[in-house]
């Protein structure tokens, strides 16, 4: 809930992606200026890097005894005023300029964070650079030794953070919209953040979380490039990446490339940078179509009972964002040969634990004593790799998009949406008279499809007897690709022999 609120807030005020949302309150306490942070390079291009706070600061790992005393500059960052009603509007004034808030979609009230007045604390970089001249990092420090063993992490320092100045309450509301065509409703969770005044009580909230002040809700880091002798450089320019001198790109250890290297786009280092699309954003989908057909074949060749069971468990995962996040974390740890801690499984609610255990069993893992163990055989490896490929895409979908995908499954329009993207012409137009697109002639079904595509930065509109998809030509994101992978995977699971 806290992570969803901070992510939602940054989407409104930080279009360039310079800030990183704090994902939990424990990390908020650890986010001190000059703290060391590890940036974990992910496997797929659409996966956002993961950041983890270390228990030391930059000064703690320098060889010289003289400690660093950073000069801290503090200023106002955001002042937001707005109301949470059925129809909400407002304007945020930030250090990045004014951002207009737009709310729409019948029956769905978008989550909007109102953290009150926020302050920005940042290190004087020029002074820090001067203080760090001729200083070196002790590479024998135990914390750094563990980083060097992993070989796919970058050392960063925290140089800026955004903190609250007032006590806030984050409340979560579960909404079920009207049924679509009398068949199925869309169940979504919305998160509201409001400043508490005079001990106001949040009513009609499923869950409420009180956040004290000051709490860090976002931060930014600078990567370090560390040489063999411990000398280091601050990577201040865009495009300049950190790391350790002995780690070349070809030396970085990625998990079981033999099982995963057949998938498209696997060797892109970071998410969020967009994809090179000289012929338009949708052209990337065309390029990967045949590979995706091949990559999801392990789903198609499963026995019907096995495939149905896996599809059923995945439907339960789609309806719960927290469970999806845990499943993605477990798969990620397994791929990197890290056994998921028993506490992670033990902390889950019994139904969630059952769903996660069932999913792992169905994709080739035995769970013994809380620790998953891969079954022998190439088939099990390919099946798990395929499942990880799909889960990693689903986990990167925007808020409530997974729930919309689940609704599309229940409405049985996933095959039509896959065909729509596959059959589109170069300019994004598709003939609605195509028999495979017949389900989309229904107005309510098409409305659900529009909302799903809109979450992936694709504007879907019906023009007479055709459907047109439009994506931003400027700064295209990876979201259309994530959507297409998600649709293809779900289609393969739901396909009849």
Curated annotation (Swiss-Prot):
- Site feature: Cleavage: 270-271
Positions of modified residues (S-(2-succinyl)cysteine): 45, 156, 168, 180, 235, 371, 409, 418, 491
Locate residues linked as Glycyl lysine isopeptide (Lys-Gly) (interchain with G-Cter in ubiquitin). Answer: 120, 189
Region Membrane targeting domain: start-end pairs? 1-56
GO biological process assignments:
cellular response to tumor necrosis factor; cellular response to virus; positive regulation of intrinsic apoptotic signaling pathway; positive regulation of MAPK cascade; programmed cell death; pyroptotic inflammatory response
Keyword vocabulary terms for this entry: Cell membrane, Cytoplasm, Isopeptide bond, Lipoprotein, Membrane, Necrosis, Palmitate, Transmembrane, Transmembrane beta strand, Ubl conjugation
UniProt KW tRNA processing keyword: no
Record's comment on post-translational modification: Cleavage at Asp-270 by CASP3 (mature and uncleaved precursor forms) or granzyme B (GZMB) relieves autoinhibition and is sufficient to initiate pyroptosis.
Write out the GO cellular component annotations.
cytoplasm; cytosol; membrane; plasma membrane
One Gene Ontology molecular-function label: cardiolipin binding
User: Does the UniProt entry include the keyword Membrane?
Assistant: yes
UniProt comment concerning the protein's domains: Intramolecular interactions between N- and C-terminal domains may be important for autoinhibition in the absence of activation signal. The intrinsic pyroptosis-inducing activity is carried by the N-terminal domain, that is released upon cleavage by CASP3 or granzyme B (GZMB).
Concerning its family, UniProt says: Belongs to the gasdermin family.
What protein am I looking at? Gasdermin-E
Instruction: Name the gene.
Output: GSDME
